[in-house]
């Protein structure tokens, strides 16, 4: 019983999907002393305050890797209680401006697309005769090493990593050029723009 859980809790985390969020919240009652953390991507703070009749609301974007205590967790607006709750699960990023925080929702939406790149790469190896376990191990280790290298060198900027990872007429340059010509990165940016519009509406 959602209402019973709310009544017995001091902190309520809203984790329902956006398409049913408004319907469910309208049926529930939140006392003004309750602290609310919303994980609902497309319901903004103003609407949340109207739906819950509560002003003590924070939006947060924890991603699945918090299971292994990794990854960024965006909190808007900054809130000490929410930060203390999430700081053990990942790297907390506090944003004052909700419009700016929506940009982080947009970039967080690339998760499935990222995993699909791993999936396509591994399946390509498998179709070429590589054992599935070997292919999955190789691809996961490859992307792990690239991600760790990016973390270690983030102060240099990612443009430098792009430049440093290719040689004139080399294999990496060829793949980058082919993807660029196919407008892969343009479509990637367009997709994030579309998500930004969706979460900002």
Where do the protein language model's features map onto the residues?
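Rossmann-like NAD(P)(H) cofactor-binding subdomain of soluble oxidoreductases
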Residues: 1-75, 79-81
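Transmembrane alpha-helical core positions of polytopic small-molecule transporters
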Residues: 15, 111-115, 168-169
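Structured helix-beta-strand junction loops
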Residues: 8, 31, 88-89, 168
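NAD(P)-dependent Rossmann-like dehydrogenase/reductase catalytic/cofactor-binding core
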Residues: 140, 144-201
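Residues at or immediately preceding the N-termini of alpha-helices
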Residues: 2-3, 79, 132, 158, ...
């Amino acid at each position: 019983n959602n209402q019973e859980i709310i009544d017995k809790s001091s902190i309520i985390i809203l984790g329902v999907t956006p398409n049913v969020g408004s319907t469910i919240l309208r049926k529930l009652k939140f006392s003004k002393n309750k602290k609310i953390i919303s994980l609902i991507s497309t319901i903004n703070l103003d609407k949340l305050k109207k739906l819950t009749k509560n002003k003590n609301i924070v939006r947060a974007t924890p991603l699945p890797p918090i299971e292994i205590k990794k990854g960024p967790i965006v909190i808007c607006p900054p809130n000490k209680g929410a930060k203390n709750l999430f700081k053990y699960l990942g790297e907390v990023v506090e944003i004052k401006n909700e419009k700016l925080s929506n940009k982080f929702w947009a970039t967080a939406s690339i998760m499935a697309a990222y995993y699909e790149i791993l999936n396509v790469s591994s399946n390509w190896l498998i179709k070429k005769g590589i054992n599935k376990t070997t292919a999955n191990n190789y691809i996961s280790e490859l992307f792990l090493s690239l991600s760790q290298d990016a973390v270690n060198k983030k102060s240099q900027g990612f443009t430098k990593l792009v430049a440093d990872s290719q040689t004139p007429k080399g294999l990496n340059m060829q793949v980058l050029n082919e993807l660029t010509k196919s407008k892969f990165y343009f479509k990637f940016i367009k997709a994030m723009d579309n998500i930004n519009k969706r979460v900002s509406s």
